Amino acid sequence: MKVGRFLVIIAFCFYVLYLEKIIHTRPHKKCDWRSWEQWESTGNPVRIALVADPQLVDDLTYDYPRPLIGIVKWISDQFLRRHWRYLHKSLKPDITFIMGDLMDTGREFATEEFKKDYFRMMNVLDPKFTNKLEIYPGNHDIGFGNHAIVKDIQRFESLFGPTSRSIDVGNHTLVIVDGIRLSNNVNPQVYQPARDFLKSFETNKDNSRPRILLSHVPLFRPAINSCGELREKDDVIKYGLGYQYQNLLLPELSESILKAVEPIAAFAGDDHDYCEVVHNYQVDTREAATTEYNVKAFSMTSGILYPGYQLLSLNYPYDNPKADQKSSYQTKLCILPNQIQIYVWYGASISIFFALILLRTAIFFFGTDRYSLPLYKTHARRFSLSTTIHLFKKIVRITLSTFISYTWIPFLLFIFLNIFII
C-alpha cells in the first residue's frame, strides 16, 4: 500500500471516529457536574438528569414506505441509545426522569403493538445504565384532557406507577403533577386521582423541604413572555391546541398547581425546545415567584436542530424552613449534536472525494496518447459512440474501484462504532 493512500485511509478513519464518537461524547463531558456546580462545601448534592420527549419513531409516525420508515427508526433509535448511554456513563446521575412522550403514537397502540414497542424502548433507553429511573406520561402516551384514554392510563400506571406522585430526595420533594389528567373535567376516573393528589399538598404543607415541580405540559404564560436566548424557535410559546394536544395548561389550572405546590422551580417537557420563564402568583397575601424551565427534547426527530437534556443539582443541608430555599437548586442545559448536519457532512465529504477520484481518472485517460486531443486538424480522430461509452464505463469502473479501496476500512469502522456503542 502506498504511503499516500495509507495516510488518506487513516485520515478517513479519524474523520469517522470524530463524527461517530468524539462529537457525541463531548457534550456530556462539557456538562460535567464539577464544571458548573457552585455549591459551598456544606452538604452532598443530589444530581438528577431530566430527559424529555424521546418519542420513539414507530410505524405510524410518518407516511413513508416500510423500508424507509425502518431506516428512520434505526437512525433515531441509534441516536437515543448512544446519548442515553453516554449521559449515564459520563455523568452518573443519582436519578433520571423521563418526562413523558415515550413513544410517538403510543396512545394509539393495541396491547400487542404496545408491548413490542415497550420492549424496544427498554432496549434503547436501557434502565440498567441508570442508578434510579422515574417515568411519567405525556399526551402521546395517554392522550390529553377530556380525551385522555382510561385504558392507556391504566396500562401506563401498571408499568411505571401513579401518574401523579412525590419523591423525597436530598432534603427536597420532587412533585410530579399530571396536568394532562387535571385538564379533564368529564371523567372522574381520569381527573379524581390527580385532583386528590394536588389537594393533599394544599392541605398538608411541610415547608421544611423545598419543592421542585415536574410535569409534562408547561404552565400557562402570556404570549409576550420571552423564553430567553437559548431557544431555537420563536422567542415565545403561544397557547395552542389540537387533536390530543394542548401546549400550555389553562391559566386557572396553572395557578392552582403553583399555589398548591409552591415550588422553588418547575420543569416541563412537551414543547421540544428550551424555554425559561418566571411565573408570579399570590399565595394568600404573599407574593410568590417560580422559574419554569422547558427541557429540550432528547430525540433527533423532534423538529429542532439540537436536541438536549437538563441537569438538576439539589443541595439543601438544612432542616430549617427559614433557610434560603431558592438557592438550593442549580440547573444546566446540555445540548446534543445536530445528527442531520453530521449526515450532511458525510454526504458532502463522500461526494467531493468521489468527484476528485473521477476527475483524476478522467484526466489520466484523456492525457494519454491514445485518448489525447489532436494538436492539428489533420490529426483528428473520429470517436464512435460505442468507443465513448466504453471509455466512460472504464473511467467509472476504475473510479469506483479506487473509491472502495480508500473507503472500505473507514466504512467497517463506521459499522463497528454503530453496532458496538462504546
Curated annotation (Swiss-Prot):
<feature type="transmembrane region" description="Helical">
    <location>
        <begin position="339"/>
        <end position="359"/>
    </location>
</feature>
<keyword id="KW-0472">Membrane</keyword>
<keyword id="KW-0256">Endoplasmic reticulum</keyword>
<dbReference type="InterPro" id="IPR033308">
    <property type="entry name" value="PGAP5/Cdc1/Ted1"/>
</dbReference>
<keyword id="KW-0812">Transmembrane</keyword>
<feature type="signal peptide">
    <location>
        <begin position="1"/>
        <end position="19"/>
    </location>
</feature>
<dbReference type="GO" id="GO:0016787">
    <property type="term" value="F:hydrolase activity"/>
</dbReference>
<dbReference type="GO" id="GO:0005789">
    <property type="term" value="C:endoplasmic reticulum membrane"/>
</dbReference>
<dbReference type="Pfam" id="PF00149">
    <property type="entry name" value="Metallophos"/>
</dbReference>
<dbReference type="InterPro" id="IPR041834">
    <property type="entry name" value="MPP_Cdc1"/>
</dbReference>
<dbReference type="InterPro" id="IPR029052">
    <property type="entry name" value="Metallo-depent_PP-like"/>
</dbReference>
<dbReference type="GO" id="GO:0006506">
    <property type="term" value="P:GPI anchor biosynthetic process"/>
</dbReference>
<dbReference type="GO" id="GO:0005783">
    <property type="term" value="C:endoplasmic reticulum"/>
</dbReference>
<keyword id="KW-1133">Transmembrane helix</keyword>
<feature type="transmembrane region" description="Helical">
    <location>
        <begin position="402"/>
        <end position="422"/>
    </location>
</feature>
<protein>
    <recommendedName>
        <fullName>Uncharacterized protein C630.12</fullName>
    </recommendedName>
</protein>
<keyword id="KW-0732">Signal</keyword>
<dbReference type="GO" id="GO:0016020">
    <property type="term" value="C:membrane"/>
</dbReference>
<dbReference type="InterPro" id="IPR004843">
    <property type="entry name" value="Calcineurin-like_PHP_ApaH"/>
</dbReference>
